[in-house]
Amino acid sequence: MKKNSFKRILSFFLAAVMLFGMLPAVFAQGAGTNDVDYAITNPYATVDWKNYGQYKASLHNHSIVSDGDNDFRYVIETYYSMGYDILAITDHGTVDRSWTEPNYVPALQLALGFRRENGFEKPTGLTQGRYNQITSGSDRGGRGMLRVPYGIENNPTSFNNSHVNSWFVDYGNGVLGGTSDYETPIKNVEALGGLSVINHPGEYTGARNEKDFDKAYNEDYDYYINKFARLLKMYPSCLGIDVNSKGD
């Protein structure tokens, strides 16, 4: 599959996942909020779903390359065994350049892996034979698991977790990034031809700690809402917001 074709398919898939993931929460909140006026337009109403495949994908994942608990190879094998069709590994500040020779930044890995008993562990990758087997699905009825290239979670040392996931372009490796700075990685990824999403904004805004859903519409959050809206409008390659990560 050509790179541009796959990017278009993934763009469509990402947008669909985020839209349908948001609907239950929006309706649940709207049911108890009488003073909020909004309309939801389904951009996929005319899609003939009978002619499109349905794929099980995971696009935001970590390993011991950054702050994950499991080895790089184990993460891949686990998703494959669970029947996934598409996988991206997006370790903090470290571009996924290969599933056979994992890329890692030792100083960054040590800093982010402080929770682990052994903060630095050299990640292990797949053998070339196993990589070929997984991506072709030769031991799974021909249903291979597609690797999304160059996955990374940008701004690894941001003090308020202003993180941005990106794919398809080799950007951000070893770059510490800035606190509250979503725009720099989004802009640079777009310039290189990649795709991105804004991650778990509730960690940045503090809204994840609100127990009352109605307070999500408090004017105190207008600044953040406008900030994200501007980024999404200005950079078409930023496809949306990963709102469900870590309980947001």
Regions of interest found by a model, annotated:
Residues N4-S5, P43-Y44, R73-V75, I225-A229:
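A generic local structural motif
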Residues F20-T33:
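Sec-dependent signal peptide cleavage junction
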Residues K2-F13:
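Bacterial N-terminal signal peptides that target proteins for export
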Residues L14-L19:
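Hydrophobic alpha-helical transmembrane signal-anchor segments
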Residues D214-G247:
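Structural recognition of alpha->loop->beta junctions
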Residues D35-N209, P236-C238, D242-D248:
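A metal-dependent hydrolase metal-coordination microenvironment
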